[in-house]
Amino acid sequence: MILPKNMKNKNLLITGGAGFIGSHVVRLFVNAYKNYTIYNLDMLTYAGNLENLKDVESADNYKFIKADITDENTINSLFEEHQFTDVIHLAAESHVDRSITDPLAFAKTNILGTMVLLNAFKNTWKDNFEGKRFYHVSTDEVYGTLGETGLFTETTSYDPNSPYSASKASSDHFVRA
């Protein structure tokens, strides 16, 4: 992802930034956009590890927040305090096998957590969304199983086949609504 370097100062919230993919996204923004303040919000569950970010932890434009995206009071307070201009939402329960043994945890984080973030974003900016962005990261698993050949596109019908993919499909629909 290449963005213009001349973009104004922003307060960017990245959820799930201590995870494998999230840490790469955090690092990219911390290093490439010194005029942004990057807030990494992560609950540090089994999938998050701050060791992934040792090289940027002392950067002037980087802040870590340990919090749960389903905690509405905390999330609302953070949005009010920091006035995030943009959100990149990567936080998720993402292990298919775990979703089968504990589907409620996946519904809570992936659906409710996304809704809490969306509501905080909406309530913070009310009717002034100009220049504000909410990027929601999903998974190809919402489309089901591909098989040996073929491909998925943005017009492929949803066909989730695990609690994980069903929870991500649901969160996709809330973001689009």
Residues of each region from the PLM?
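N-terminal Rossmann-like NAD(P)+-binding domain of SDR-like oxidoreductases, especially those catalyzing
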Residues: M1-A177
